[in-house]
């Protein structure tokens, strides 16, 4: 099996780490794209924590050594070079565009939980029509607040992607942030936290830009 770790650019040398199953890392080129892979004798098999950690470690090492990395999620394995090349060839143009998008960037995740308990607590005394009107007011307020939280972070981001999340989530997003703006992004998150003590704001990262591999350009 051939395990794919990602598409890279400006990688001078492979990192001195082993891949999944302790296989050495290799480079190969398909349609002008530089891929980092490793080989494992056995087919697939059970997914282990060690394999997941090995994959994540390789991607992190590539992020530290490359101008751009388009990371592959764990499980992108191919039986041989021909199957790998065929899979990459069909998506080569899109991969090249997305590689350009993520160049020099890191991913940060944001989850915001905000309650509307006041509206919920009073809903028992409302008629059906009044309840629906009250809920509409609450939802409009939630959408407005979500935009207010998003816009200052989007200003520092090259792209963003929003996810559905749980019903209690006011917003759940990923932001593609240039490395030089990472500290400023963190500062803005902290200002949002200070300005909205009633909300739970959780920022994670930096991560490899997994959320933008399939999305291409986000909502920005």
What are these regions (language model features)?
Residues 1-220:
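An interfacial alpha-helical scaffold signature
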């Amino acid at each position: 099996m051939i395990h794919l770790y990602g598409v890279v650019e400006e990688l001078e040398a492979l990192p001195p780490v082993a891949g999944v199953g302790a296989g050495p890392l290799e480079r190969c080129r398909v349609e002008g794209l530089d891929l980092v892979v490793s080989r494992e004798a056995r087919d697939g098999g059970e997914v282990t924590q060690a394999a997941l950690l090995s994959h994540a470690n390789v991607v992190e090492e590539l992020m530290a050594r490359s101008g751009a990395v388009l990371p592959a999620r764990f499980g992108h394995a191919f039986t041989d070079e021909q199957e790998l090349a065929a899979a990459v060839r069909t998506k080569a143009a899109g991969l090249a565009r997305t590689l350009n998008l993520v160049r020099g960037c890191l991913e940060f995740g944001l989850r915001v939980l905000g309650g509307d308990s006041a509206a919920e607590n009073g809903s028992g005394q409302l008629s059906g029509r009044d309840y629906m009107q009250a809920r509409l007011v609450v939802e409009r307020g939630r959408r407005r607040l979500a935009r207010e939280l998003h816009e200052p972070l989007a200003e520092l981001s090259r792209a963003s992607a929003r996810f559905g999340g749980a019903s209690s989530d006011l917003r759940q997003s990923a932001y593609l942030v240039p490395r030089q703006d990472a500290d400023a992004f963190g500062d803005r998150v902290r200002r949002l936290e200070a300005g909205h003590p009633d909300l739970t704001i959780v920022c994670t990262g930096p991560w490899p830009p997994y959320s933008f591999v399939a999305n291409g350009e986000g909502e920005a």
